[in-house]
């Protein structure tokens, strides 16, 4: 497991979020992806302890594509 920005399935696009909604939105979203938890960091959802089988941003480059 590792920490990172989760991406939308089939894309390399991060989940955007608003500052101030740190845990309300990203926490449950990260948990759905089987991570321990997560929060909003630099306007995207950063997840803690993401399982190795779940892709995170940067593994397939840094451009958003769909």
UniProtKB/Swiss-Prot annotation:
One family name in Pfam for this protein: Toxin_3
Record-linked InterPro entries: LCN-type_CS_alpha_beta_dom, Scorpion_toxin-like, Scorpion_toxin-like_sf, Scorpion_toxinL, Scorpion_toxinL/defensin
Disulfide partners: 13-64, 17-40, 26-45, 30-47
What is an example of a GO molecular function annotated in this UniProt entry? toxin activity
**What's a single GO CC term here?**
extracellular region
Q: Which domain of life is it from?
A: Eukaryota
The organs and tissues expressing this protein are described as: Expressed by the venom gland.
GO BP term, example = defense response
The subcellular localization recorded is: Secreted
Residues annotated as domain LCN-type CS-alpha/beta: 2-65
The record ties this protein, via SUPFAM superfamilies, to: Scorpion toxin-like (SSF57095)
Q: Keywords of this protein's UniProt record, alphabetized?
A: Disulfide bond, Secreted
Keyword Signal appears in the UniProt entry: no
**Described purpose of this protein according to its UniProt entry:** This protein is not toxic.
* Record note on domains: Has the structural arrangement of an alpha-helix connected to antiparallel beta-sheets by disulfide bonds (CS-alpha/beta).
Family, as annotated: Belongs to the long (4 C-C) scorpion toxin superfamily. Sodium channel inhibitor family. Beta subfamily.
Kindly provide the name given to this protein in its UniProt entry.
Neurotoxin-like protein STR1
Q: Per the UniProt entry, what species is this protein from, by scientific name?
A: Androctonus australis (Sahara scorpion)
């Amino acid at each position: 497991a590792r920490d990172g920005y989760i991406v939308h399935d089939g894309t390399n696009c991060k989940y955007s979020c608003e500052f101030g909604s740190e845990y309300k939105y990203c926490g449950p979203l990260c948990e759905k992806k089987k991570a321990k938890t997560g929060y909003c960091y630099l306007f995207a959802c950063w997840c803690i302890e993401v399982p190795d089988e779940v892709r995170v941003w940067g593994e397939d480059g840094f451009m958003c594509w769909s």
